[in-house]
Amino acid sequence: MEALKKIAGVTAAQYVTDGMTIGLGTGSTAYYFVEEIGRRIKEEGLQVVGVTTSSVTTKQAEGLGIPLTSIDDIDCIDLTVDGADEVDKAFNGIKGGGAALLMEKIVATPTKEYIWVVDESKLVDHLGAFKLPVEVVQYGADRLFRVFERAGYKPSFRMKGDKRLITDMQNFIIDLNLGCIENPCEFGRLLDQTVGVVEHGLFNGMVDKVIVAGQAGVTVLEANQST
């Protein structure tokens, strides 16, 4: 599985050219993309500036010598490469298994070309088998948990050891065990309107390409070619 993730990440790095501002994703597959960008800077003299999606990726990029800038200092990003936990046939996805969904969506939004790198196990007919992360402010989080519970969403707080995980943005994550999300766009809008929810892990209609690594090789799926 790690070999497939590496293939996907390295393949995505081929889309990066000199002069680009690039979004550096978070997670086990995006890790290999960031590593390959670091290698190209060192060995090929690649000239890029990165914008990171988590403190983990920031540390990785700094260690590789990738020049970084703040999302606040730019207006657009040429290319962002990130992982995904699930991708359906309509190119909707669930992200946030690494607890970086808020920063990931902030970086994805001003991106001209948004690419996901996944192994073939992440392709699904319907989203929801992977728990849906919902980032919530700490104030009122327990009340919101009960709201989700009453709605039948089977919520659980994301934990780190015996304490609730706190994101880079100082929020909690409530994971929803939905089983199947029949209408991701509608459910995303519902969460958007829920007071106390900062962001959720439904990335609907955002991705342009999905690079899929499988036993038979690498496939590049284009969102604008989907039916």
UniProtKB/Swiss-Prot annotation:
Biological processes annotated in GO: pentose-phosphate shunt, non-oxidative branch
UniProt subunit comment: Homodimer.
Sample GO molecular function, one term: ribose-5-phosphate isomerase activity
Stored InterPro entries: NagB/RpiA_transferase-like, Ribose-5P_isomerase, Ribose5P_isomerase_typA_subgr, Ribose5P_isomerase_type_A
Residue ranges crossing the lipid bilayer per the database entry: none
Residues annotated to bind substrate: 26-29, 82-85, 95-98, 122
SUPFAM superfamilies: D-ribose-5-phosphate isomerase (RpiA), lid domain, NagB/RpiA/CoA transferase-like
Reactions that this protein is recorded to catalyse: aldehydo-D-ribose 5-phosphate = D-ribulose 5-phosphate
Function (record text): Catalyzes the reversible conversion of ribose-5-phosphate to ribulose 5-phosphate.
Protein name: Ribose-5-phosphate isomerase A
Pathway: Carbohydrate degradation; pentose phosphate pathway; D-ribose 5-phosphate from D-ribulose 5-phosphate (non-oxidative stage): step 1/1
EC number annotated for this UniProt entry: 5.3.1.6
Active-site feature positions: 104
EC top class, as a word: isomerase
